[in-house]
Regions:
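Acetyl-CoA-dependent GNAT
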Residues: 14, 30-92, 103-104, 109, ...
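Conserved acetyl-CoA-binding loop of GNAT-fold acetyltransferases
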Residues: 135-145
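Terminal substrate-recognition subdomain of acyl/acetyltransferases
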Residues: 2-5, 87-88, 122, 145-147, ...
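Conserved beta-strand-loop-alpha-helix junction that forms the acyl-donor binding cleft
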Residues: 94, 120-130, 148-150
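Conserved acetyl-CoA-binding loop-helix of GNAT-fold acetyltransferases
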Residues: 95-112, 131-136
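Hydrophobic pocket/interface hotspot
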Residues: 20, 24, 45
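A short beta-loop-alpha structural element at the N-terminal edge
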Residues: 8-20
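Conserved GNAT acetyl-CoA-binding A-motif
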Residues: 110-123
């Protein structure tokens, strides 16, 4: 799939591990947006990113991987009809529409897989760019977890639960 700014979004492979780690490492080390140990190892981070039931994707611009996402069931069993996704982009991708392209791809992919909704369980409220992006692609805030994230600079901040229905009223159950 070709996304915004000429990005090609495709399923990730083991050959992409180094590039994905180069994107994830600074995000995780900063500790501002994910509930991931800041000192997570490369192997543990990649095992998590590629873990079932998720499918990992990369976004390439001019042959260079500048973004990644993974999409899969939010919960097993009775919650398996709701998707979840995570995203990260390289700093060079800022302002180029790559995060939006990854989000739109994730939503399209989830619809094609038969998911009826997508939920983000833990969006850090101080991650204003992400909150704004998710709202502009159709997510609403359906819950607020007071002080649930320990931000390295701001201390305890709220985490948001964001949700979007993927199927319309005319869709069969």
């Amino acid at each position: 799939m070709t996304g915004s700014g000429g990005a090609v979004i495709r399923p990730a492979s083991p050959d992409d591990h180094d590039a994905i780690w180069q994107i994830l490492r600074p995000v995780y080390r900063a500790g501002k947006t994910y509930c991931i140990p800041r000192d997570i190892t490369r192997d543990d981070a990649l095992a998590d990113w590629f873990a079932q039931p998720f499918t990992a994707f990369v976004a390439e611009v001019d042959g260079r991987i500048l973004g990644t996402s993974h999409v899969g069931a939010n919960r097993p069993g009775g919650g398996a009809h709701v998707a979840n996704a995570s995203f990260a982009t390289h700093p060079e991708a800022r302002g180029r529409g790559l995060a939006r392209a990854l989000a739109q791809h994730a939503l399209s992919w989830a619809r094609a897989q038969g998911y009826r909704a997508m939920q983000f369980n833990f969006v850090v409220s101080t991650n204003l760019d992400a909150v704004h992006l998710w709202q502009t692609v159709g997510f609403g805030v359906v819950g607020r977890l007071p002080g649930a994230f320990l931000h390295p600079r701001h201390g305890p901040v709220d985490a948001l639960v964001m949700f979007q229905t993927l199927k319309g009223d005319s869709d069969e159950p």
